[in-house]
Swiss-Prot record:
Protein name: Adapter protein MecA
Family designation: Belongs to the MecA family.
Gene3D superfamilies referenced in this protein's UniProt entry, alphabetically: 3.30.70.1950
Pfam families in the cross-refs: MecA
A molecular-function term among this protein's GO annotations: protein-macromolecule adaptor activity
Phylogenetic placement of the source organism: Bacteria, Bacillati, Bacillota, Bacilli, Lactobacillales
Function comment: Enables the recognition and targeting of unfolded and aggregated proteins to the ClpC protease or to other proteins involved in proteolysis.
The encoding gene: mecA
Assembly information from the UniProt record: Homodimer.
Record InterPro entries: MecA_C_sf, Neg-reg_MecA
Length: 249
């Protein structure tokens, strides 16, 4: 493993396939938010000699970029103390009875409570650096990454013009089960990432599901890595089932 400091708030860790294997990790492990992935990230950081300003810091965010012969992990340091956990809303009297607008405001207020406004604005300042980092990923590397995950999984990014459209999407797909889903807000637009497991499904399954999604959602103009770094994440896992199970007033 090798580490390079891009600037005071961003590290780049280069992990070989052999390193992944030694730690019991596979590329597909990075597609689904889980404790195993988070533990791996912090194990790697413990093994490396981190710069002093990254030790005992606030919240760290991670982004994975697959390469042909390695995985690049970009570690971003912020002043936030912790990330939003949907379980934090458990102390609300009855969020299932909220209107869509009230539900959304509760999510956003909960997120902003995790750190001061200045800290959140600092996250946006990483835009230029992360954009330059994105441009270092060559087309062949992207193709390798796509081929790697295409066998068992596929993911989509969907856009919604307002929260009412999100609610309609969730209600219209109440019988649909997905492997993973995340919910973001960027500007006035809402985004949802959907991860589908394809190994046990017929060849046409992915196309059919995408067509169903687009009955209620729009094609997104942002990628998941972009949203991870630039958007406000409202629900970082199980977004679709949570919205499906919510009763709107």
């Amino acid at each position: 493993m090798e580490m390079k400091q891009i600037n005071e708030t961003t590290l780049k860790i280069m992990i070989t396939m052999e390193d992944l294997e030694e730690h019991g990790m596979e590329l597909k492990d990075f597609l689904i938010p889980q404790e195993k992935t988070e533990e791996f990230f912090y194990t790697v950081m413990d093994e490396l000699d981190l710069p002093d300003n990254f030790k005992n810091s606030g919240m760290l965010s991670f982004r994975v970029t697959p390469r042909k012969d390695r995985v690049d992990v970009f570690v971003n340091k912020s002043d936030l103390k912790e990330a939003l956990d949907f379980n934090d809303l458990s102390d609300m009297e009855d969020y299932s009875g909220l209107s869509p607008e009230e539900f959304l405001k509760a999510l956003e207020d909960n997120f902003m409570d995790k750190g001061d406004i200045e800290a959140h604005h600092k996250l946006e300042e990483h835009d230029k650096t992360l954009k330059e980092v994105d441009e270092t990923m060559t087309e062949p590397a992207k193709e390798v990454a796509e081929e790697t995950i295409r066998e068992d999984y596929t993911h989509y990014v969907l856009a919604f013009s307002d929260f009412d459209q999100v609610v309609t999407f969730a209600q219209g797909l109440k019988n649909v089960s997905v492997e993973g889903s995340e919910f973001y807000k960027l500007g006035d637009v809402y985004y949802m990432t959907i991860l589908l497991y394809l190994a046990d499904e017929p060849d046409y399954y992915a196309n059919n599901m995408y067509a169903r999604f687009l009955e209620y959602a729009n094609v997104a103009d942002r990628t998941r890595p972009y949203l991870q770094e630039h958007a406000t994440i409202l629900m970082e896992e199980d977004a679709l089932p949570v919205l499906q199970a919510t009763k709107w007033s």
